């Protein structure tokens, strides 16, 4: 139904919706002038919004699955997507909307363009929603992706897209090799995907240069920046089109929620899809594919993440400093073969990390830009798989779990956990040996974490 076919009563609601959109745009514009920490604390929830919510100074949890409408005209305008509404929580929800707006602003910090976000029920659902729309239609198509990626991403691409749907998967074995990226892309490439830094190997890639190559082939560059978070790196500023996060990890460090998000620049690169897909990808996904697939997040989980998000920058600063201390300790231990941490000069990729990973607004704190490299590291244990498992089993304070990004230190052996299902070939591509331990450093004092590692190595 076109707007000219609408009744005057429905058109009145459409006009009201335009006024609502204008007010929201004005709020976003004001918040984009604020510093990162201020955006993380407030998002777009201001005093006017609080007064409309019984004066609550925190974003309310809208737990009702459905919205009440004033009348049938209001319902018609809302369900035709002609005015802002949430209608049904599988499509949208006010609490989730506050989280989406905050994340879009944080990821766009320092970026001149416009962005939008779509929050999902998990990190993997965010990756699926960020990639699947580019695989529509028929004819030959391929994906170019870094092989240094999370096991779930590998399985989604290889099994679901590749083996089940016939999409050609072209793995880039060395993401720092621009020539390999270039030779893998062609006119049939639908999207380019990388993790920066990667999980668990912390592999690096030059986002700016890979973005140029992707755009030359009229396809978007999608970056999973879960490990860095917007506090340390914002790929949109480097030329990426879409950023995905598993919000369950470093952003929601309390570990009380599973969630994901895709954040996209407006007017992204893509040779396929309708104009709406390119113009505002996150909104397109939210109103159509997301609506139909249904990977919605609980509003209560959104509220938990909003509360964790408020301290993101200071938390990533602390945890990065702790991780550097622990990485240097590990590097000096004879029982350790290799330490993978982007902040070590011995790390393959240190130069890229040092150019790319900065504590946001660090110069405003100290007068100088501050490199911070995150709180995930990996180390291989001398003596092989058996010895690595012995060290792992001897941890007394560090938690053994497949999780990461917690405020508590957590370790896993990726070869038998996060990267088990992809098999030996996939693990070899990702460079995940059986004696690799992934450690995500928490907020404990680093001396105590080191003491636990030390006793595990000595036992």
Q: Predicted regions: what is each one?
A:
Residues 63-67, 90, 121, 413-415, ...:
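Pocket-edge structural micro-motifs
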Residues 52, 58-105:
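A glycine-/small-polar-enriched, mobile loop at the entrance of the PLP active site in fold-type I
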Residues 68-72, 269-270, 312, 384-387, ...:
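Short, acidic Gly/Pro/Ser/Thr-rich loop/turn segments
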């Amino acid at each position: 139904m076109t707007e000219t076919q609408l009744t005057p009563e429905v058109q009145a609601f459409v006009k009201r919706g335009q006024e609502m959109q204008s007010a929201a745009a004005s709020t976003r514009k004001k918040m984009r002038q604020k510093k990162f920490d201020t955006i993380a604390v407030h998002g777009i929830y201001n005093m006017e919004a609080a007064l409309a919510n019984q004066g609550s100074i925190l974003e309310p949890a809208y737990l009702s699955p459905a919205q009440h409408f004033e009348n049938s005209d209001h319902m018609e305008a809302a369900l035709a997507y002609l005015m802002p509404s949430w209608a049904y929580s599988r499509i949208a929800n006010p609490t989730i909307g506050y989280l989406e707006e905050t994340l879009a602003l944080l990821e766009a910090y320092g970026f001149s363009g416009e962005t939008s976000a779509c929050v999902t029920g998990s990190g993997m659902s965010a990756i699926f929603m960020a990639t699947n729309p580019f695989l529509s239609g028929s004819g030959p198509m391929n994906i170019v992706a870094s092989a240094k990626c999370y096991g779930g991403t590998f399985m989604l691409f290889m099994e679901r897209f590749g083996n089940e749907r016939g999409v050609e998967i072209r793995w880039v074995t060395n993401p720092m090799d621009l020539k390999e990226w270039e030779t893998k892309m062609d006119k049939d490439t639908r999207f380019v995907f990388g993790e920066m830094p990667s999980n668990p190997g912390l592999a690096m890639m030059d986002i700016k240069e890979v973005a140029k190559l992707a755009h030359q082939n009229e396809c978007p560059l999608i970056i999973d920046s879960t490990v860095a978070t917007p506090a340390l790196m914002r790929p949109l500023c480097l030329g990426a089109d879409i950023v995905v996060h598993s919000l369950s990890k470093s952003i929601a460090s309390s570990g009380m929620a599973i969630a994901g998000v895709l954040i996209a620049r407006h007017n992204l690169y893509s040779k396929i899809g309708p104009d709406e897909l390119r113009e505002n990808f996150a909104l397109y996904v939210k109103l159509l594919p997301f609506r139909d697939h249904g990977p919605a997040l609980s509003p209560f989980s959104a509220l938990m993440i909003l509360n964790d998000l408020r301290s993101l920058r200071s938390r990533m600063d602390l945890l990065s400093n702790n991780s550097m201390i622990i990485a240097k300790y590990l590097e000096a231990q004879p029982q350790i073969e290799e330490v993978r941490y982007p902040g070590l000069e011995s790390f393959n990729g240190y130069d890229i990390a040092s150019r790319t990973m900065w504590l946001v607004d660090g110069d405003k704190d100290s007068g100088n830009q501050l490199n911070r490299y995150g709180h995930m590291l990996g180390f291989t244990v001398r003596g092989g798989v058996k010895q690595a498992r012995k060290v792992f089993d001897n941890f007394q304070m560090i938690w053994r779990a497949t999780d990461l990004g917690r405020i508590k230190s957590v370790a896993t052996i990726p070869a038998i956990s996060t990267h088990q299902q992809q098999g030996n070939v996939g693990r070899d591509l990702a460079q995940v040996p059986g004696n690799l331990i992934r450690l995500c450093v928490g907020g404990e004092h680093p001396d105590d974490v080191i003491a636990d590692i030390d006793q595990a190595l000595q036992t």
